[in-house]
C-alpha cells in the first residue's frame, strides 16, 4: 500500500482500455465500399467456406467483414454498413456486415431471428 506522500508525488496510473473494433472510431456502425468479396476457411477444428469481404471505410480504414446468413448479393463496389463483432474461427475478421442495409439485401426466406438478417415480417 502506497503512503499518502508517495501518491502525492506520483499518482496512480489509469489503465487505458484498448478497443476491439478500432476502425469504427467509437461509432456504432460505419459505411464502406467492398473492394473484394471472397470465401475463406476457418481455423481448426471447423471446416467451411465462410463468406467475407474486404471493405474500404469512409474514414480510410480497410477491414475484413463477415457476411452472415445464407446467400448474399454483394460484389465489388457494393456499399455496405458494418458493425463490430468478431468471428471466432476466422483470424483477423473483427467486423460483421449489416444485412438489409444499403446495398446488402436481407436473407431470403428467413423466418426466425429476422431482425438479425434484415428481413421484414411476411404478412400472412
From Swiss-Prot:
The UniProt keyword set, sorted, is: Methylation, Ribonucleoprotein, Ribosomal protein, RNA-binding, rRNA-binding, tRNA-binding
Q: GO molecular function of the protein, one example? A: structural constituent of ribosome
Task: State the GO CC annotations.
Answer: small ribosomal subunit
Q: Does the keyword Chaperone apply?
A: no
Q: Report the InterPro entries cross-referenced here.
A: NA-bd_OB-fold (IPR012340), Ribosomal_uS12 (IPR006032), Ribosomal_uS12_bac (IPR005679)
Pfam families, alphabetized: Ribosom_S12_S23 (PF00164)
Q: Which residues carry this modification: 3-methylthioaspartic acid?
A: 89
The UniProt similarity line reads: Belongs to the universal ribosomal protein uS12 family.
Note the CDD domains from the entry. Ribosomal_S12
Share what the entry says about its subunit structure, partners included: Part of the 30S ribosomal subunit. Contacts proteins S8 and S17. May interact with IF1 in the 30S initiation complex.
KW Manganese (keyword) present: no
Q: What is the stated purpose of this protein?
A: With S4 and S5 plays an important role in translational accuracy. Interacts with and stabilizes bases of the 16S rRNA that are involved in tRNA selection in the A site and with the mRNA backbone. Located at the interface of the 30S and 50S subunits, it traverses the body of the 30S subunit contacting proteins on the other side and probably holding the rRNA structure together. The combined cluster of proteins S8, S12 and S17 appears to hold together the shoulder and platform of the 30S subunit.
PANTHER family reported for this sequence: 30S RIBOSOMAL PROTEIN S12 FAMILY MEMBER
Cystine pairings recorded for this chain? none
- What are the recorded Gene Ontology BP terms? translation
Known NCBIfam families for this protein?
rpsL_bact
Q: What is this protein called?
A: Small ribosomal subunit protein uS12
Amino acid at each position: 500500500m502506497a503512503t499518502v506522500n508517495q501518491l502525492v508525488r506520483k499518482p496512480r496510473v489509469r489503465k487505458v482500455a484498448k478497443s476491439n473494433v478500432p476502425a469504427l472510431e467509437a461509432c456504432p456502425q460505419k459505411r464502406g465500399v467492398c473492394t473484394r468479396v471472397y470465401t475463406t476457411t476457418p481455423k481448426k477444428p471447423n471446416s467451411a467456406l465462410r463468406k467475407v469481404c474486404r471493405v474500404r471505410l469512409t474514414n480510410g480504414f480497410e477491414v475484413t467483414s463477415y457476411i452472415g446468413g445464407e446467400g448474399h448479393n454483394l460484389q465489388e463496389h457494393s456499399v455496405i454498413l458494418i458493425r463490430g463483432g468478431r468471428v471466432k474461427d476466422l483470424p483477423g475478421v473483427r467486423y460483421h456486415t449489416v444485412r438489409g442495409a444499403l446495398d446488402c439485401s436481407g436473407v431470403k426466406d428467413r423466418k426466425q431471428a429476422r431482425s438479425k438478417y434484415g428481413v421484414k415480417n411476411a404478412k400472412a
